[in-house]
Amino acid sequence: MKMMLVRRFRVLILMVFLVACALHIALDLLPRLERRGARPSGEPGCSCAQPAAEVAAPGWAQVRGRPGEPPAASSAAGDAGWPNKHTLRILQDFSSDPSSNLSSHSLEKLPPAAEPAERALRGRDPGALRPHDPAHRPLLRDPGPRRSESPPGPGGDASLLARLFEHPLYRVAVPPLTEEDVLFNVNSDTRLSPKAAENPDWPHAGAEGAEFLSPGEAAVDSYPNWLKFHIGINRYELYSRHNPAIEALLHDLSSQRITSVAMKSGGTQLKLIMTFQNYGQALFKPMKQTREQETPPDFFYFSDYERHNAEIAAFHLDRILDFRRVPPVAGRMVNMTKEIRDVTRDKKLWRTFFISPANNICFYGECSYYCSTEHALCGKPDQIEGSLAAFLPDLSLAKRKTWRNPWRRSYHKRKKAEWEVDPDYCEEVKQTPPYDSSHRILDVMDMTIFDFLMGNMDRHHYETFEKFGNETFIIHLDNGRGFGKYSHDELSILVPLQQCCRIRKSTYLRLQLLAKEEYKLSLLMAESLRGDQVAPVLYQPHLEALDRRLRVVLKAVRDCVERNGLHSVVDDDLDTEHRAASAR
């Protein structure tokens, strides 16, 4: 009797197992059957990239065109072959926390179509990297001033931005670049194309039927814009003034189809990693505050919201100041259902979606602050606004070093940092490497001015590219806590400049230029931000605060000059001999 019960129990367990397997198989086949049924021709489906006919079918999510955009333009990307929606790549990474320097956040294996790009950068392809070959040269160099072309920015030749970028202060060339001065040395004969990748479904963002470049044309033109951005990075700048890939990349960030979404690990607030159809990736910060809302006066700087529009505005401000140290950022309206929930494989993220009493789609994810039902992010009804910041090259390809900001705040409710109580703190900093022998202290002054103009108190660390050593620029990452208060100027942000009394001549002259009525900073920012998809990006009082804070910065420099003399305060980086010595 007992043996019969045991046998029946085993049979029951086996049946349950078989039923579970059958259900899993059915659930896996269901999306394919739906897509097959959605085709007019009813031809059999496959697990490869979707053909144009399938992309156009109602069962396959379509790329949204901008309002007023012709249907043909909005569907151009939809007519091209799409990669599998869960495909990820490891050529990039974006970092805002110190621990990000230790490991990559890649989620899946590199897809076959992206392997040639990685081989070209890693040097695993025998023909990709030739350090001693004449063809071994940087792909993207600054073409230099060209009056026949419109400068970067949404304005035309008659725009205020165009006039600014034609000014001599914005036409100073960087020193000649050597192999040691570029982040990636890629063989310019290596092209990314369907033939090179041996994959006919390599996504192309152009119109249907568009052909790839002939072998005689520049190979770099066949690369996706995110890769053009990466290979344009050098010792002196993240991107050159006249790099056309930057405007194209901004457009990609706001229009490329999102194929995969995952939560970014680390950090205090929710951020999403979004992957696009061309294997590019970006960091998505959702909207948490309206434009006119200010940071509550009782909030500490370390518990303030991270604002998506601050990330967008920071990129444009950095470019107007001619620092070019912020990765490209663009605003975008995202469909929370089709572009986040339906494409994510992150179960922790997926489980936090719900429908609010007002019938809006909401989610909250997982993070240290503001990730709960009470602080959920809700769409209208499923559209949410956010910023998308382009990833920097993956840490496995281009290591970055994280530095503690000497003027880091205490991040404590009661304690003060040393620099807040010691007026001679800068003298101690200037005796500490790398601030004792390099131009790093001048980079910190640039960063101080940048943060003061935005009102950003949250600059605890910064990063540099390891390849370039100490003689390189600071990357201005993670600017979401800027533009929080337009009615208050946080003078403590300016303490490094007041203590050290050092500034680059180029920075000082540009600040003076932007204080003039004909090149007013607020007007330049308004024009630059006007081209973003979520414009207006900044509330008008924030733009007016920029002009007010600029006057405060210039007064601080004048006070330093009166105390210490012009030559002790202003470092003449525009002098030819000085710049040649700096390059060495």
Swiss-Prot record:
A GO molecular-function annotation: ATP binding
Residue stretches of biased makeup (Basic and acidic residues): 116-149
Comp. bias intervals (Low complexity): 71-81, 95-112
Residues making up the signal peptide according to the UniProt record: none
EC code(s) of this entry: 2.7.11.1
Keywords on record: ATP-binding, Biomineralization, Calcium, Disease variant, Disulfide bond, Endoplasmic reticulum, Glycoprotein, Golgi apparatus, Kinase, Manganese, Membrane, Metal-binding, Nucleotide-binding, Phosphoprotein, Secreted, Serine/threonine-protein kinase, Signal-anchor, Transferase, Transmembrane, Transmembrane helix
GO CC annotation terms, alphabetical: endoplasmic reticulum lumen; extracellular exosome; extracellular space; Golgi apparatus; Golgi membrane; nucleoplasm
Family stated for the protein in its record: Belongs to the FAM20 family.
The protein, known as: Extracellular serine/threonine protein kinase FAM20C
Organism name: Homo sapiens
Lineage: Eukaryota, Metazoa, Chordata, Craniata, Vertebrata
Gene of this entry: FAM20C
